[in-house]
Amino acid sequence: MNIKALAQKICADSPELAGLTTTVEKELLHYEVLASMAKHGFLKQLTFQGGTCLRMMYGSNRLSEDLDFVGGANFDFDQLAHLRDCLHEDLSQRHNLRVNVTEPNYDKLSDREAIQVGRWKISIETEPEKKSLPWQKVKLEIATVVAHTQVLRPLVKTYPSVPDAYVSILLNCETLEEIAADKFVALALRRAIKARDVWDIAWLNQRNVQVDAELVRTKFQDYHQTTGFEALSGRLKELPSYMASGDFEQEMRRFLHSSTVANSIEQDGFVDYLVDTVIRMGDQLLRAQSSGSPKFKM
């Protein structure tokens, strides 16, 4: 499969993808990376999560960025010692292109007392005839955090031209409810508000996904955060000014079909709708957690 040619074909067949060829190319590489990991058995101990999971497992309309997994609190990164070589060999042979895979420092990942995140960076030269162009890059992250839910699902075809062989790949992934909880934890704990978290929360809400305050509390504990709900409250207060800044619209145009853009961020009132949705859901979480903790314990 020629990734560059297939990405161009997909975008040519769908005018609404105009200008998104690089992002489509990255999504095709996601399939390739997951296929290689499945082939060599690396996925068995991992659980897929995050926005790319929403896209590749549940059919989200937001294009994806990175591959995020959790392996559990006691995950042993040594079982991934050959991941770099396998990815390099499979991608190089399949595409006859130059590939570079960097892996984490395994010695630094051996501390079981703290949460560890192993990061692999896969770069592929998709246009070798144009040396001035940057290589396509995919980030793969695996964290020593527990998945509290797990369902086995096949990959979905995000584009009709995606090879049928990919949909035979089965992955363990979090439920929509847990991904929603993750999104609120991320909203609270990231250094800054991320546009994709806001979009994903509203997308999940439109699918009637309920967020469990107790699961959010447990996840804050998983990350050793004792003031998670306070941080979430602060972020909800910051949200209106962030959304009014224009940063949200600018970022999301990289990940949305033109038809989705026209029906969402270009519509009057859409930003207000997002703010209202996320704040309402967040306030429900805050009320639920406070009602379970009496002011005076007896």
Label the predicted regions.
Residues F69:
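Structural signature of FAD isoalloxazine-binding scaffolds in flavoprotein oxidoreductases
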Residues M1-L46, M57-S60, G72-M298:
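Structured mid-to-C-terminal alpha-helical surface segments
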Residues Q49-T52:
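Glycine-rich beta-strand-to-loop/alpha-helix junction loops that act as flexible
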Residues S64:
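Anion-coordinating catalytic cores for phosphoryl-, nucleotidyl-, and glycosidic chemistry
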